[in-house]
Curated annotation (Swiss-Prot):
Family: Belongs to the thioester dehydratase family. FabZ subfamily.
Organism: Rubrobacter xylanophilus (strain DSM 9941 / JCM 11954 / NBRC 16129 / PRD-1)
Active site, renumbered: 51
Pfam families, per database record: FabA
Function: Involved in unsaturated fatty acids biosynthesis. Catalyzes the dehydration of short chain beta-hydroxyacyl-ACPs and long chain saturated and unsaturated beta-hydroxyacyl-ACPs.
Keyword Calcium: no
Reaction equation(s) it catalyzes: a (3R)-hydroxyacyl-[ACP] = a (2E)-enoyl-[ACP] + H2O
Lipid biosynthesis keyword on record: yes
Protein name (Swiss-Prot/TrEMBL): 3-hydroxyacyl-[acyl-carrier-protein] dehydratase FabZ
EC number: 4.2.1.59
Annotated compartments: Cytoplasm
Matching PANTHER family: 3-HYDROXYACYL-[ACYL-CARRIER-PROTEIN] DEHYDRATASE (PTHR30272:SF1)
SUPFAM superfamilies the UniProt entry points to: Thioesterase/thiol ester dehydrase-isomerase
Length: 150
């Protein structure tokens, strides 16, 4: 699988759907190593209705989720993991450096530094216009579909 990936290719790798699919395209992809993706943040995002009326700001937890989805594309592009679910196992060192607002292109870079069996870890960075918006260590566990509620 080679970048760039558009919405159809992303949906083949991830189970997320609107309104919770938070990646519009994957610009760079090294399966199991690294992925770079973009979310074009529009005024029409459903979360802006309540966060915050008159002062729309993308919730920080959704920035972290978007980074995790980019990382999941990087993992799910590896044949061994395709079709599994990547579930959050932990989030460390989260820092928000800049607000993300309508009109921003949120560029997310995830380096996967551990991928072994049923667990993985990556370092996510998110930028708007070259300015760092967020950073986090992302830990995840893999489940077979149908196993995630156990």
């Amino acid at each position: 699988m080679r970048a760039p990936l558009g919405p159809a290719e992303i949906r083949r790798l991830l189970p997320h759907r609107y309104p919770f699919l938070l990646v519009d395209r994957i610009e760079e992809l090294e399966p199991g190593v690294r992925a770079v993706g973009v979310k074009n943040v529009t005024q029409n995002e459903p979360f802006f209705q309540g966060h915050f009326p008159g002062y729309p700001v993308m919730p920080g937890v959704l920035i972290v989720e978007a980074m995790a989805q980019v990382g999941a594309v990087g993992v799910m592009a590896v044949e061994e993991y395709r079709g599994r679910l990547a579930l959050f196992a932990g989030i460390d060192g989260v820092r928000f450096r800049r607000q993300v607002v309508p009109g921003d292109a949120l560029r997310m870079e995830v380096e996967i530094d551990r991928l072994r069996g049923r667990v993985g870890r990556g370092r996510g960075l998110a930028f708007v216009g070259g300015e760092r918006a967020c950073e986090a260590e992302l830990m995840f566990a893999f489940a077979e579909r149908g196993e995630e509620s156990r």
